[in-house]
């Protein structure tokens, strides 16, 4: 304190101090030790800003969380409203949304899908904590729908006799639940054929499944 009887503490002065007070007058002097306790004041940490993100289904991406504490306290991270397949390990957020993350569940989403605008937003809260202080940020991650090509299951070669009728019955489906159409090319352009004498031989027919965008 010196001789001014004043002390303006800083954030680094937390602790217990013994202060000697000396009183002196005409013909006497007196010393006394006074215990002074400076309580710690925990300062707010600094949480670096996280921007909103736009990603695609089946695309893995990461967010590196960064925060600092002016008192050099240890900083931990947590998150609220995490999607089921997302992971936060220490300060690294990792997510690879599956192809089923964005779905057509209403008239609006079906209309958006028609114009290839289908997406879904996820509001995730990230929290940085140190000692008695914490700070949070809400981040919107928008996942865009990714179309997958229709699937045609393999089928065994077809063998018929001359004058027999042929009917092709492919097993085809769309993993996104879209309607599909089938077309045929090569030896025939439809799914049926009536063979004639003289048709003996090996022929190839190409079956194509399309959802209007992918095949």
Give residue spans per PLM region:
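A short beta-strand micro-motif common to beta-rich folds, especially ectodomain repeats
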Residues: 15-25, 105-130, 201-211
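Proline-centered linker/hinge motifs at extracellular inter-domain junctions
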Residues: 42-46, 75, 86, 147-151, ...
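Surface-exposed, proline-enriched loop/turn segments that connect beta strands in immunoglobulin-like
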Residues: 48-52, 82-83, 153-157
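Strand-loop-strand motifs at the edges of beta-sheets in extracellular beta-sandwich domains
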Residues: 1-9, 85-112, 185-196, 206
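C-terminal edge beta-strand
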Residues: 28-39, 133-144, 214-215
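A short beta-strand segment in extracellular, disulfide-stabilized domains
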Residues: 60-67, 165-172
């Amino acid at each position: 304190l010196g001789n001014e009887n004043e002390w303006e503490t800083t954030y680094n002065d937390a602790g217990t101090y013994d202060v000697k007070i000396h009183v002196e007058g005409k013909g006497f002097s007196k010393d006394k030790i006074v215990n002074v306790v400076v309580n710690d004041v925990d300062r707010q940490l600094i949480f670096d800003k996280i921007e909103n993100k736009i990603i695609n289904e089946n695309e893995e991406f990461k967010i590196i969380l960064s925060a600092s504490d002016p008192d050099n306290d240890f900083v931990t991270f947590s998150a609220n409203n995490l999607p089921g397949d997302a992971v936060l390990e220490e300060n690294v957020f990792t997510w690879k949304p599956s192809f089923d993350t964005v779905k057509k569940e209403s008239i609006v989403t079906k209309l958006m899908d028609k114009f290839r605008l289908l997406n879904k937003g996820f509001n995730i809260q990230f929290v940085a904590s140190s000692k008695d202080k914490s700070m949070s940020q809400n981040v919107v991650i928008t996942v865009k729908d990714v179309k997958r090509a229709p699937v045609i299951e393999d089928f065994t070669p077809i063998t018929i006799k001359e004058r027999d009728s042929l009917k092709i019955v492919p097993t085809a489906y769309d993993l996104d639940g879209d309607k599909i159409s089938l077309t045929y090319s090569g030896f025939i352009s439809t799914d049926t054929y009536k063979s004639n004498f003289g048709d003996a031989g090996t022929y190839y027919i190409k079956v194509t499944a399309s959802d209007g965008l992918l095949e």
